[in-house]
A protein has these predicted regions:
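RNA-binding basic/glycine-rich loop and surface signature characteristic of RAMP-family CRISPR effectors
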Residues: 1-297
Length: 297
């Protein structure tokens, strides 16, 4: 595995949805998430990281060091036990005595998890198995962090009634020929999410490398390509704008870089229904020295 990254990064993702639900809210009957005060749509960071994890699992299948820790149907404890077994810990082990004999025990377990699981190396993790076992390695801060995505304009979710010709039970079949269901869609929305990559945490904590970074960009660009569903409609990443600093700690505040990105609805558009209804520009004259900007799509 290559060396940890040496440069700080910030990045902005622009993605859109057409006739779909990008992130349902279980507290609101799976309606698309909305800021109730402004009407702007929201997509959680957890949702976006799930897409990235799924994409990495697809494109890096069976590649050493690129397993996924947080995945559907696999108890976290199962992966945790691999690390414990790696350092010789089982159910009969006196962990306190072992830690006294080996002061590096916590670090060895943490290194094992970071080296084997891409999402721990990238996003960090809280591994409760180790915490309960009195091991000081259960919380790992990841160098890559994402905020919530927010729509560029307020959204107008629609509840669509749908019918099904198949009947669930024999009793229902005696009285009706169809069943009715409902689903939520957004006719169109463009979302923006901002993210951060800390070279400092990569060096100190997880070893997130240049190879990992390239896989991260690839996964972000393709995170909806391998995850299509009728519920989500048509979703696509339209822009990935990356700011690279020439130092580990950075050369400019993140907000100044994000402020150089302008996404504006075209003057003659009332209700956007396509990505081409927006103008996306980067004011490169406002980007400080020692920071480079790359539009990866």
């Amino acid at each position: 595995m290559s060396e940890p990254i040496k440069n700080r990064y910030e990045f902005t993702i622009l993605f859109d949805v057409e006739n779909g639900n990008p992130n349902g809210d279980p507290d609101a009957g799976n309606m698309p998430r909305v800021d109730p005060e402004t009407g702007y749509g929201l997509v959680t960071d957890v949702c976006l990281k799930r897409k990235i994890r799924n994409c990495i699992e697809t494109i890096c299948e069976d590649k050493p060091g690129y397993r996924i820790y947080v995945k559907e149907g696999v108890p976290l404890q199962r992966s945790d036990k691999e690390a414990l077994s790696y350092v010789g810990i089982d159910e009969k082990t006196d962990i306190k005595k072992m830690k006294k004999d080996d002061p590096e025990l916590d670090r060895k377990i943490c290194n094992f998890m970071c080296q084997n699981f891409f999402d721990i190396r990238t996003f960090g993790a809280v591994m409760t198995t180790f915490v309960k076992s009195a091991l000081n390695c259960g919380q790992v801060r990841g160098p890559v962090q994402l905020g919530f995505a927010r729509s560029i304009d307020p959204i107008m979710p629609q509840e669509i009634t749908i019918t099904r010709v198949a009947i669930t039970t024999e009793k229902d079949a005696e009285n009706k020929n169809t069943e009715i269901g409902r689903k939520y869609i957004i006719p169109y929305a463009l979302y923006r999410a901002d993210g951060y990559v800390s070279a400092n945490l990569a060096r100190k904590m997880t070893g997130f490398s240049e190879d990992d970074l390239q896989y991260l960009w690839k996964a972000i660009i393709n995170m909806f390509e391998y995850d299509h569903s009728a519920a989500r409609g048509n979703m696509a990443v339209r822009e990935l704008i990356v700011f690279k600093h020439d130092s580990e700690l950075g050369n400019a505040p993140a907000y100044k870089l994000f402020d150089t990105i302008h996404v504006q609805k075209k003057d003659d558009v009332i209700a956007p229904r396509n990505y081409t209804d927006y103008n996306v520009t980067v004011d490169e004259s406002q980007i400080p020295e020692h920071v480079t900007c790359t539009r990866m799509i």
